[in-house]
Amino acid sequence: VRINSKLLLAVAVMPLLFTATAKAELNVFACEAEYAALAKALAPSADIYSATTAMQDPHQVQARPSLIAKMRQADLVVCAGADLEIGWLPMLQMKASNPKVKSTDKGLFFAADQVDTLDKLASVDRSMGDVHAKGNPHLHLDPERMLSIAQALSAKMIKLDPQNSSEYQQSLADFSQRWQAKIPQWQEQAKGLAGKKVIAYHSSFRYLFNWTGIEQVADLEPKPGLAPTSSHLASLLTRAEQGDVMAVIVASYQDERGAKWLGERANLPVLMLPMSVGGNEQSQDLFSLYDSLLALLNGVK
């Protein structure tokens, strides 16, 4: 009996091909580190790239050639939305010319479209500074909203890559189970923070404060997007001298000079909080990001 060696080879290779295609291999471009981390949790075998780190201001990004190349390869683009990336994402999309990620009915996903945002504005003008009419975009620091976003992102992945739907469903189930188990623990840790007052830079931690019950009584920015001025810092010092402020808070990517000036003169601790995954050594994923934020806030004496 003659054995066709080519046929044997083809039969031998078939299981390998099947194994290769059975893994979800979406190319994911995340605008921020938190959404790269979420995408990794929901699609562990996907190829994921983050355009920014927790040490960068996601409002201000240059449409560099490396970013254009990455977006050109993307099957899915995951961003905060609510116009956080309005200064650079449209330019990047135009230069990349990738039809797969041009619109939200295809491979473009905005987290802010999946949940209610805080602080929506009916109208906006330039005198108001760098504000977002669609609401505050920094919504990854609310655990309930993040769970809703995870469910919607998983559904988007299944729509784009239906042959691997079982992997996405299993990953979402694993993430949701772990996340829902942590929420009551985080709520317990946050109990002592309710009613505490802080002065913070920008509205970066609006959702975290809203969830924990912390009150931001003043902003280091005179207007959103403007650096602290000496006259504004002087007015903040007057506010801080009322004696009810727990700390001055800045995010990992923000300039802390104004905060340090105020902290020294008002005798207040200055707390640098991780804005996202990678914002400090402890924040290696979304779970440890929340753990670190609560530990730092509870550590203020």
Task: Label the predicted regions.
Residues 1-4:
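N-terminal secretory signal peptides that target proteins for export/translocation
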Residues 8-19:
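Bacterial N-terminal signal peptides
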Residues 24-301:
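Extracytoplasmic metal-acquisition and chelation regions
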